[in-house]
């Protein structure tokens, strides 16, 4: 298996006389060791049901694949579906399936259950992220009913701060039977099923995103002469207002002197503050949104439309790296660098930006001042860009580059 710019190291996981290996990226959850909560969930599940109790399993929020791939390794006859909203997690799950000689596993991207097309799983299992908001968690706990066969099981682990909330929510559901509730080492495991009188809830459910389970608040934003509306989401940065790095990018957009760009690419858009500012200030003909986080893409698209950007001008590219998978060049690239992905990934992104831009096109990049200094130093040995400007503010910087 070839190395990639996101790779950090390989972890070994020994379980039930099976040794598994997992490639991890430093920007994925639990890249130092296999998560304790994941191990607790697997141990509890296998001790109660054995390794061959379930024939069709859905691993929700699969990360780099520990739960789903381990269950498949222990019982090769079962069918496994795994999904995550993070394209990098999905990529590493696929790599780890290959690394462990596992075939016949469906691994794909989805925001909640939105892109799950089958509804006859006998086990839905998840290590629920600690950053998820309570509406997101309760939506998942309820929506699982629409994807289970009759008598199917939901098995989850949560961090202790969510234990009381989960227990209370499940306890008041008239059609839910809690089969197990166990806690240890800062985590709590729940097993539950929907009873025979669940009725309408066992039908496929509507999209959680469309129902608004991810929304945290609606707000009006004022920054300098810019006014816009936002619906902000849980588990994305800048829920109250644009942060320093977004402000630097918005100021750089205000300072552009060239004619309005025909096509712009916005990467890692978060809640969409910078994307909305670019739309209102520049009125581009097309906006390409690029991110590995599907929630960020959907939220930003929604906020652009909320601020009267026509939906047919927006294109979403859910992928790792900065690019659109098309041959069309863009006039302007704007975004915040993901520093946690590491220096190799950042350098690869700079190369991708050069590939996307037309000659004379500009890139507006924000990051910590340390990261921007490293980028400028690296560009001294390259010939793709002219450094036009750098602005600093409270440990952050914006860098303006022009494509030669």
Locate each region found by the language model:
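Class I SAM-dependent transferase core
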Residues: 2-49, 206-256
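Conserved beta-strand signature within the Rossmann-like core of class I S-adenosyl-L-methionine
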Residues: 151-159, 360-368
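A short glycine-rich, Lys/Arg-flanked "PGG" loop and its adjoining helix->strand segment in the class I
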Residues: 138-150, 347-359
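Conserved SAM/SAH cofactor-binding pocket of Class I
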Residues: 36-117, 123-126, 132, 244-323
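N-terminal auxiliary segments of SAM/dcSAM-dependent transferases
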Residues: 1-15, 27-31, 153-219
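Short "lid" loop at the C-terminus of a central beta-strand within the Rossmann-like core
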Residues: 130-131, 159-164, 339-340, 368-373
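A SAM-dependent methyltransferase catalytic signature shared across enzymes that methylate proteins
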Residues: 102, 166-180, 193-198, 375-389, ...
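A short SAM/SAH-binding and catalytic strip from SAM-dependent methyltransferases
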Residues: 122-135, 331-344
């Amino acid at each position: 298996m070839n190395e990639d710019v996101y790779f950090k190291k390989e972890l070994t996981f020994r379980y039930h006389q099976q040794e598994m290996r997992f490639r991890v990226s430093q920007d994925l959850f639990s890249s130092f060791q296999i998560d304790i909560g994941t191990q607790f969930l697997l141990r509890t599940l296998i001790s109660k049901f054995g390794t061959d109790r379930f024939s069709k399993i859905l691993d929700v929020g699969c990360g780099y694949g520990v739960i789903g791939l381990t269950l498949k390794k222990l019982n090769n006859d079962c069918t496994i579906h795994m999904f995550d909203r993070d394209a990098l997690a999905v990529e590493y799950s696929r790599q780890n399936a290959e690394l462990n000689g596992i075939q016949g596993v469906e691994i794909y991207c989805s925001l909640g259950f939105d892109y799950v097309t089958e509804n006859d799983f006998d086990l839905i299992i998840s290590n629920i992220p600690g950053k998820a908001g309570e509406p997101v968690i309760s939506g998942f706990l309820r929506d699982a009913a629409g994807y289970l066969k009759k008598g199917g099981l939901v098995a989850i682990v949560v961090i202790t701060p969510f234990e009381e909330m989960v227990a209370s929510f499940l306890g008041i559901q008239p059609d839910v039977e809690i089969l197990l509730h166990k806690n240890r080492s800062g985590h709590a495991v729940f097993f539950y099923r929907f009873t025979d009188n669940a009725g309408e809830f066992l039908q496929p459910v509507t999209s959680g995103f469309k129902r608004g389970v991810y929304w945290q608040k609606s707000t009006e934003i004022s920054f300098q002469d810019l006014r816009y509306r936002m619906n902000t989401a849980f588990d994305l940065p800048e829920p109250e207002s644009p942060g320093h790095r977004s402000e630097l990018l918005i100021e750089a957009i205000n300072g552009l002197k060239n004619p309005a760009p025909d096509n712009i690419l916005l990467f890692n858009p978060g809640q969409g503050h910078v994307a909305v500012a670019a739309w209102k200030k520049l009125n581009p003909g097309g906006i390409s949104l690029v991110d590995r986080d599907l929630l960020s893409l959907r939220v930003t698209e929604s906020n652009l439309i909320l601020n009267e950007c026509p939906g047919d001008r927006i294109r979403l590219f859910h992928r790792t790296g900065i690019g659109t998978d098309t041959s069309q060049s863009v006039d302007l690239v704007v975004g915040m660098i993901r520093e946690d992905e590491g220096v190799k990934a950042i350098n690869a992104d700079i190369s991708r930006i050069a590939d996307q831009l037309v000659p004379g096109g500009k890139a507006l990049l924000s990051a910590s001042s340390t990261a921007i200094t490293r980028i400028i130093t690296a560009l001294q040995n390259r010939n793709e860009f002219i450094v036009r400007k750098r602005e600093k503010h409270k440990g952050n910087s914006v860098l303006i580059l022009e494509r030669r």
